[in-house]
């Protein structure tokens, strides 16, 4: 069994509904930071979550998002097993028999959550995107920066080789993006 802290706050899914589906770019980046840190830790000990979605992210009393529900988690060194798939949050390799899941799979799922936080639109399931990549035709919200849009495109790439290999790589680009936005803001103050 797994012992976890008791969390009674709303899930990100409930929070999104309450806030009409869109969260500001800056707020989303701040909210996702502890989730990225949690993923970096579990990946460092050889575990892949495999079920990141807004209903598996819950707020604690301090307003920080916590990653929950490790029921689908896998040891990344194991052979391919039956995968748990949850719509647009599931990486394409989780559907394919020949592919292995890894930290890059959680990167895809996290970016799908982030995309939804910013746009209020769910990413189409990867199996549909493999047929015809509809993500390219979706327009990002006008208040989302080009840099964030590029980070999301890379994180949601259908090809593992074009995606961030780890959440640490993703985190570096997010932090760099946040710092560049702060510099631009300072210039105009």
PLM-predicted stretches and their roles:
Residues 1-11:
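Conserved short submotifs of the Hanks-type protein kinase catalytic core
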Residues 12-23:
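AlphaC helix of the protein kinase catalytic domain
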Residues 31-32:
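Activation segment signature within eukaryotic-like protein kinase domains
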Residues 36-47:
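Protein kinase catalytic-loop region centered on the HRD/HxD motif
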Residues 80-93:
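Conserved activation segment of eukaryotic-like protein kinases, specifically the C-terminal portion
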Residues 93-104:
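Conserved end of the kinase activation segment
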Residues 143-158:
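Conserved C-terminal C-lobe helix
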């Amino acid at each position: 069994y797994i012992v976890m802290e008791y969390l009674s706050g709303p899930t990100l899914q409930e929070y999104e509904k309450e806030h009409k589906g869109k969260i500001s770019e800056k707020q989303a980046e701040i909210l996702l930071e502890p989730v990225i840190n949690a993923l970096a830790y579990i990946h460092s000990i050889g575990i892949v979550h495999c079920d990141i979605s807004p209903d598996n992210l819950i707020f604690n009393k301090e307003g920080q998002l916590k990653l929950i529900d490790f029921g689908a988690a896998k040891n990344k060194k194991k052979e391919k097993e039956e995968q748990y798939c949850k719509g647009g949050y599931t990486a394409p390799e989780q559907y394919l028999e020949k592919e292995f899941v890894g930290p890059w799979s959680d990167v895809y799922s996290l970016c799908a959550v982030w995309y939804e936080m910013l746009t209020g639109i769910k990413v189409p399931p990867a199996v549909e995107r493999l047929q015809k990549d509809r993500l390219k035709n979706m327009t990002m919200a006008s208040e989302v920066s080009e840099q964030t849009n590029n980070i999301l495109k890379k994180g949601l790439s259908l090809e593992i080789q074009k995606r961030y290999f780890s959440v640490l790589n993703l985190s570096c680009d997010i932090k760099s993006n946040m710092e560049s936005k702060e510099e631009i803001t300072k210039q105009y103050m």
